[in-house]
């Protein structure tokens, strides 16, 4: 009996098998894996949510540093 799960590559849609020895899973190839990475890096892929003001992060970190020093 074959228990290996068939999946589609998220980039090209090619059918492949989910196997522990596939170093590119869930992608079918290194090419598709790198395309996906590039899409995240260029922000053409994003996780939906509200934008965060970078200044508020700095302010929050500074407040935490002051608490840690006390």
From Swiss-Prot:
Keywords: Metal-binding, Zinc. Binds 1 zinc ion. GO terms for biological process: regulation of DNA-templated transcription. It comes from the Bacteria. Coiled coil: none annotated. Zn(2+) binds at residues 9, 12, 28, 32. Residues 43-70 are annotated as: Disordered. Its cofactor is Zn(2+). GO terms for molecular function: DNA topoisomerase type II (double strand cut, ATP-hydrolyzing) inhibitor activity; zinc ion binding. Gene3D superfamilies: Erythroid Transcription Factor GATA-1, subunit A. Pfam families: YacG. Inhibits all the catalytic activities of DNA gyrase by preventing its interaction with DNA. Acts by binding directly to the C-terminal domain of GyrB, which probably disrupts DNA binding by the gyrase. Belongs to the DNA gyrase inhibitor YacG family. HAMAP family: DNA_gyrase_inhibitor_YacG. Interacts with GyrB. This is DNA gyrase inhibitor YacG. It comes from Legionella pneumophila (strain Lens). The gene is yacG.
């Amino acid at each position: 009996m074959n228990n290996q799960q068939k999946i589609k590559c998220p980039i090209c849609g090619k059918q492949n098998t989910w196997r522990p020895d596939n170093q590119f899973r869930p992608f079918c190839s290194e090419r598709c894996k790198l395309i996906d990475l590039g899409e995240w890096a260029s922000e053409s892929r994003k996780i939906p949510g509200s934008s965060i003001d970078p200044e508020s992060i700095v302010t929050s970190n500074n407040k935490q540093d002051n608490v840690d020093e006390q």
